[in-house]
Amino acid sequence: DVITGLHATSAILAALLYRERTGKSQRIDISLWDCAISALVNQAQNKLASGKEPQPMGSAHPNLVPYRAFEASDGWFVLAIGSDAQWQQMVEILEIDCRESWSTNSGRVKDRIEVERTLFKIFKNETITHWESMLEGIPCAPVNTIGQALSDMQSVARGAVWSVEGVQTLANPL
């Protein structure tokens, strides 16, 4: 429902722009099914490209390694290595002795289990705050509870929660 609403908003705005430019109207046809299918993004495209049925991967990204949640000594955080340069930077910071094939994302994808196992062993020994500090400049962030996310200083600064007639509610992000 939420994804469909977001797509509907985009469609309505596009139709309004089209009407403004051409004076003609548009018919919008949107379905929950179509929007849910479009949200499959990487997994669906991988199926179409390879013919292979994707398997459950938890929080892991199907095409990037490492790009998933890892457990630290005090909770979970997400590490999102999106390039070989970020990988190399992390390897240098953590002083990881790794295989040459891991220097490329394709090599890390092929050896996903061993790459992730290596990192799980490292990350479990220190706190999330420690890893955020060590990995500054490399995309990573804690996995928050809903309460932590709502009370986070960024949520507070951005006004993520409104009070309407004494009832707290999520704010419109726009």
Describe every region a protein language model picked out:
Residues D1-F77, I81-G82:
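Active-site-adjacent "lid/gating" segments in soluble enzymes
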Residues C35, D84-Q86, Q148:
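Short, solvent-exposed loop/turn segments at secondary-structure junctions
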Residues P54-Q55, V65, E71-A72, E114, ...:
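Terminal low-complexity tails and localization/encapsulation signals of metabolic enzymes
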Residues A60-P62, C98, V167-Q168:
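A short catalytic or substrate-binding loop motif that flags glycine-/basic-rich loops and adjacent residues
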Residues V65-I138:
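Aromatic-enriched alpha-helical interface/lid elements that frame and gate functional surfaces
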Residues E136-L150:
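Short, well-structured beta-strand/strand-turn elements
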